[in-house]
Structure formats: C-alpha cells, structure tokens
Amino acid sequence: MPQNEYIEQHIKQHGRRLDHDERKRKREAREAHKISEKAQKLTGWKGKQFAKKRYAEKVAMKKKIRAHEQSKVKGGSKPLDENGEALPTYLLDREQNNTAKAISSSIKQKRLEKADKFSVPLPKVRGISEEEMFKVVKTGKSKSKAWKRMITKHTFVGEGFTRRPVKMERIIRPSALRQKKANVTHPELGVTVFLPILAVKKNPQSPMYTQLGVLTKGTIIEVNVSELGMVTSGGKVVWGKYAQITNEPDRDGCVNAVLLV
C-alpha cells in the first residue's frame, strides 16, 4: 500500500469508531450553519471568492433541477404534420403523447453507443519501465544536476507546438523522434494509407505518456481519414477516426496502425 494511505490502512485493520455514522450525520447537518456564518462574516477578497464559489454552485444546482424537471415533462404533441404543415381540424383530437423523457433517454443511449469501447486488435501490450522510456540528461557546469529527462520513444506533438525555454524544460521530446503521419490499414477494405495524425487518444502505459504524446505499441491515435471519403449515416464526411498502433515505432522508424471501424 502507498505510504500516503495510512488512514485507509488503519480503517481496514481496526475499523471505524462506533459513533462514526452519527458524527458524520451531525457534521453534515452543521455544514449549512457554517456556510451561513462564513457568508455573513467573510469580508474583502475572501468574501468575494466565497460569494463567487457559492454563486457558481447555485447556478449548477438550478441547471440540474431544471434539466431533471424537463426530463419528466409530458404533454400533447403540437398540431403540426411531419412535413411542417398544419393538421386539419378533424385530426386535432388525435394527440400523440410527446414524452421528453423518451427523447432524452434515446440521446443518452446514442452517447453511450458513441462512447462504447472498441474491440481493439491488441488488447494486451508489454509494460514499459520509466528507465526504458526516459533517459537522464545531466545539466549544470559540472554535470551534477539530473532533473531533466529525454524521451527515447517516438512522440507526436501538435501543429502549434513550441518548446519551453531550455532552462525550464524538464521533459525533452527530440525533433528526430517526432511523428506526424502514420501508415493506417483499413481492416475491411484491406488498403493502407499514409494519413496525418491528429492526436494521441490513449497510451496504455500511463496517462502521463498520453499527455506527452508518446507513441508505443497499442496506443490509440486519432487520424485524419478525410482522404478515404468515409461518411456517416447522416451523409456527413468523417474527418477523425481512431486507430491502434500495431508496431514498435522506435524500432521500425515509422508508425503502423489499424483503423478501428
């Protein structure tokens, strides 16, 4: 167990106080009084910050309540035909129930389908240690400082990327190891296209590597597929699509990926 989780460790070993739930309930009940006291007594900059925070909380709560109320609204459908024309009088009494909840649930379902995980070609990859990923760069007059690190793997940086000042740059991404394009294979069509990389979506090694844009085997990247002429069911052109890297770019010198369709 990590060193900073000693409280959780103690709870697991010895349990909680017998009156823990009661104390927690009372603490939560006192919270409103404490907030009220702070709102009345705090002045100056602290008072302004507190008021700003409370205002944001109230706005968020009102939005949440309004959204919850709208999701349960039921009412008659508008007297309009599907093509936007007014219904004749003899059809006005045939009101079809319009349930906002059903609409919102269908939208949620679509979002879930969109966010659904792909069955990736490489479900498991080898772990990479920090010693393998980073090389220590010694700096200073006598080369005694060792706080800088250089990434030894291929990386992707965006179009408008600029390096930080050398004195403050802790992690170096060498220009020679930066990739802008990838050889992407379409699994159904069986064609390979040289497409530009848009972003690094997920590196399976660590969230930090995702943030740094490190390209290793199994990494999910977003590529520009506008050249393939792919369209959605609604007829819109697809620009970005996810692909998984299937090779080791630092060994091959290029990025090979399979499109996730």
Swiss-Prot record:
Residues 7-39 have a biased composition (Basic and acidic residues). Pfam families: Ribosomal_S8e. Residues 1-39, 62-82 are annotated as: Disordered. Keywords: Nucleus, Ribonucleoprotein, Ribosome biogenesis, rRNA processing. It is found in: Nucleus, Nucleolus. A motif (Nuclear localization signal 2) lies at residues 51-58. GO terms for biological process: rRNA processing. Transmembrane segments: none annotated. A motif (Nuclear localization signal 1) lies at residues 15-22. GO terms for cellular component: nucleolus; ribonucleoprotein complex. Belongs to the eukaryotic ribosomal protein eS8 family. Ribosome biogenesis protein NSA2 subfamily. Involved in the biogenesis of the 60S ribosomal subunit. May play a part in the quality control of pre-60S particles. Component of the pre-66S ribosomal particle. Interacts with NOP7 and RRP1. Interacts with RSA4 (via WD repeats). This is Ribosome biogenesis protein NSA2. It comes from Kluyveromyces lactis (strain ATCC 8585 / CBS 2359 / DSM 70799 / NBRC 1267 / NRRL Y-1140 / WM37) (Yeast). The lineage of its organism: Eukaryota, Fungi, Dikarya, Ascomycota, Saccharomycotina.
